[in-house]
Each structure stands twice: as structure tokens, then as C-alpha cells.
Amino acid sequence: MPFLDIQKKLGISLDRHFMFLSAEQPYKNAARCHAFEKEWIECAHGIGGTRAKKECKIEFDDFEECLLRYKTMRRMHDIKKQREKLMKEGKYTPPPHHSGREEPRP
């Protein structure tokens, strides 16, 4: 507990916005990972941190992938490497609009 709680005196709560993405949003639009966070919170609710790490690992991994997109980025990197490899071998020619040579617009 801080000696001087400025957030409470000013009536704001910055921490609340960093806790849950599924908290009430200003324009009622759900966050991108709302469904995954909700599943994880429902799974972990009331069972304690130690059990939740074991029993809710699948839900947490889904939520983490939605937030960080590390598998998606790895897949995109692999696709880009494969495309560059095929271009060097001469087996793939990208369409003109992918190389910056698109048709002039009227």
C-alpha cells in the first residue's frame, strides 16, 4: 500500500485497464482476445494460481497466442523464406502488384 495513493485521490484507476482486456470498453467493442481471456479466467477462477497453471494451460496458451501472435509471425516468416527460396531457384515469379509494378489507375 503506497503512502500517498494519488490514483485514489484523483478518482482514476490506471491499473484496472491493464488487468483485463475484457473489462467494459468505452464503445462496447470487445477486445480482440476477449473470448480467449474469458475462457482462461473462467477456468482459473477459484482454483488458485498453482492449480490454474497446470489445469488451465491450454486456455492460457490460446490467450497468449492471441495477444502475442508468435506462432502466426513464425509461420509468416517461414512462408516468406520459402517464397524467396523459390524466387532464387526461378520456380516462382510474384505477380506485378506484389513487386510494386502495378497497372496505372485511371
Swiss-Prot record:
Indicate whether Transferase appears among the record's keywords.
no
Query: One GO CC annotation, please?
Result: mitochondrial intermembrane space
Q: How does it sit in the membrane?
A: Peripheral membrane protein
Q: Keywords on this record?
A: Disulfide bond, Electron transport, Membrane, Mitochondrion, Mitochondrion inner membrane, Respiratory chain, Transport
Paired cysteines (S-S): 33-66, 43-56
Residue interval(s) of motif Cx9C motif 1:
33-43
InterPro entries reported in the protein's UniProt record: NADH_UbQ_OxRdtase_FeS-su5
Q: Where is the CHCH domain?
A: 30-74
One Pfam family this chain carries? Ndufs5
Q: Which GO terms describe its biological process?
A: aerobic respiration; mitochondrial respiratory chain complex I assembly; proton motive force-driven mitochondrial ATP synthesis
Spell out the CDD domains in the cross-references.
NDUFS5-like
Q: Where does the protein end up?
A: Mitochondrion inner membrane; Mitochondrion intermembrane space
- On whether Transmembrane helix is a keyword of this UniProt record, the answer is no
Its main subcellular localisation, reduced to a broad class, is: mitochondrion
Assembly, per entry: Mammalian complex I is composed of 45 different subunits. This is a component of the iron-sulfur (IP) fragment of the enzyme.
Q: What does this protein do?
A: Accessory subunit of the mitochondrial membrane respiratory chain NADH dehydrogenase (Complex I), that is believed not to be involved in catalysis. Complex I functions in the transfer of electrons from NADH to the respiratory chain. The immediate electron acceptor for the enzyme is believed to be ubiquinone.
Per the record, the domain comment is: Contains two C-X9-C motifs that are predicted to form a helix-coil-helix structure, permitting the formation of intramolecular disulfide bonds.
Q: Which family does it belong to?
A: Belongs to the complex I NDUFS5 subunit family.
- Name of the protein in its database record: NADH dehydrogenase [ubiquinone] iron-sulfur protein 5
The organism's lineage is:
Eukaryota, Metazoa, Chordata, Craniata, Vertebrata
